[in-house]
Amino acid sequence: MKRIVFMGTPDFAVPVLQKLLELKYDIVLVVTQPDRPKGRKKVITPPPVKEEAIKHDLDIFQPEKLRDDYKKITDLKPDLIVTAAYGQILPKEILEIPTFGCINVHASLLPELRGGAPIHYAIMQGKEVTGVTIMYMAEKLDAGDILTQVEVPIEQDDHVGTMHDKLSLAGANLLSETLPSLFNNEITPKKQDESLVTFASNITREQERIDWSKTANEIINQIRGLHPWPVAFTTYEGKVMKIWWGQELSKSSKSGNIGEIIEKDTDGFYVQCGNNTVVKVSEIQPAGKKRMLVEDYLKGSQDRIKIGIKLGE
């Protein structure tokens, strides 16, 4: 049985590790990021991959900087290194260790959406299809030759959370189909077309801010593409209000200035957007409060949401 070093950190990588274990591959080492402070109380918390590895009594390695600390991997002489959302770029010295190379499970159809937030960008850009790519690792980010790919449709009610789970499982299944062919030298790697490269760099605070001058469709894609993390936001009377969910309306009986609340009902409020479009907001997180339905928020007082207020100011 081939000796595999697995490298991954967040929830996305867990099904990939589980699949390798299910298929009885010899996981000689799990490399993951160091434990980090988490939550408001900054409790030191192990990454999900470490928690999964502990369940299976696997050897775990958590270097702060892999580039400076990889002798343990070299000494193991693995046949293959499999990575999935590990969080550090592998240096050339590591790429050259395994007989069958280093392969990565990436949540996009490369060469589109290289980088750390491909699921967010796929939804924010309004794509109807994304997918998973398994490719060789290269010194340049997500630029290695492609081994296999699978498409995964994005439904209208999908968001980052649902697509994260779909793509994670799709990646695990694709890996299980890819490895036998890889080990039997039955795959011809395909170079990425550099003219088609796009990037999905980590989400910035400004990308989380809703620009109400955009169309309702663009804003809903932004909300879906930032749900459930890091979450789109606006301001209401100068205070941050996170927008967890809403819907695009084909038309409204009323209109107003861009960003203005033009109407409300029992379960939402309506915001004027660009190109004479309207978004109905149905789930929010007001400043200093928990996430809640607008319906529940308004039960406290109808005055909590006022018609005529302009969001984003």
UniProtKB/Swiss-Prot annotation:
GO terms for cellular component: cytosol. The keyword Protein biosynthesis applies. CDD domains: FMT_core_Met-tRNA-FMT_N, Met_tRNA_FMT_C. One of its GO terms (molecular function) is methionyl-tRNA formyltransferase activity. Disulfide bonds: none annotated. Its EC number is 2.1.2.9. (6S)-5,6,7,8-tetrahydrofolate binds at S108, L109, L110, P111. The keyword Cell division does not apply. It comes from the Bacteria. It catalyses: L-methionyl-tRNA(fMet) + (6R)-10-formyltetrahydrofolate = N-formyl-L-methionyl-tRNA(fMet) + (6S)-5,6,7,8-tetrahydrofolate + H(+). Keywords: Protein biosynthesis, Transferase. Pfam families: Formyl_trans_C, Formyl_trans_N. Belongs to the Fmt family. HAMAP family: Formyl_trans. Attaches a formyl group to the free amino group of methionyl-tRNA(fMet). The formyl group appears to play a dual role in the initiator identity of N-formylmethionyl-tRNA by promoting its recognition by IF2 and preventing the misappropriation of this tRNA by the elongation apparatus. This is Methionyl-tRNA formyltransferase.
